[in-house]
Amino acid sequence: VSRLDPRFGMSLGFLIQVASGMYMASFDVNTTIFDVGVNSVLQGLAVGIIWVPLTVATFATLEPRYLAEGSAIYHLLRNLGSSIFISLSVTLVIVSTATNYAGMTELISDYNKALALPWLLGAWNALSGEIGRQAAMIGYINAFKAYALASFAVLPLILLVRMPKT
């Protein structure tokens, strides 16, 4: 195991994350717990495959006297990067949901004569709820695609990882 190039493990892990993101992008409002479970296994596998080679590559060229500081900076940057991506993902979901809701409700108005039928009054709330569900689903799909794209964008950067010559 120690003879494997860490770039192989990182590449494999990020490719699995890309597959996981694309799998999540195929979710719809009728997604089952099985779909979520399969995807959770994929993501767990990916993170497990990425973590050890990433840590090995990070500390391979670090002198032992800098190990404590290097570890602190490594974990700080990892946590900071995760937090930033989570914040951007939540922002993408919220903005995308609002944009799609507005787009889907453009022609649905009290002033639209085609919809001014007295028997439709009770359906307005149900219609608004369904449009909200669909808009939110589009928002989540956009975030899942961004997750897959971010995982894919990391792949060329793995080529920059260098291990010390032994």
What would you call each of these model-derived segments?
Residues 98-124:
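Juxtamembrane non-transmembrane "cap" segments at the membrane-aqueous interface
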Residues 119-120, 124-133, 161-166:
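Intrinsic disorder in cytosolic terminal tails and internal cytosolic loops
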Residues 1-107, 136, 140-165:
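C-terminal module of multi-pass small-molecule transporters
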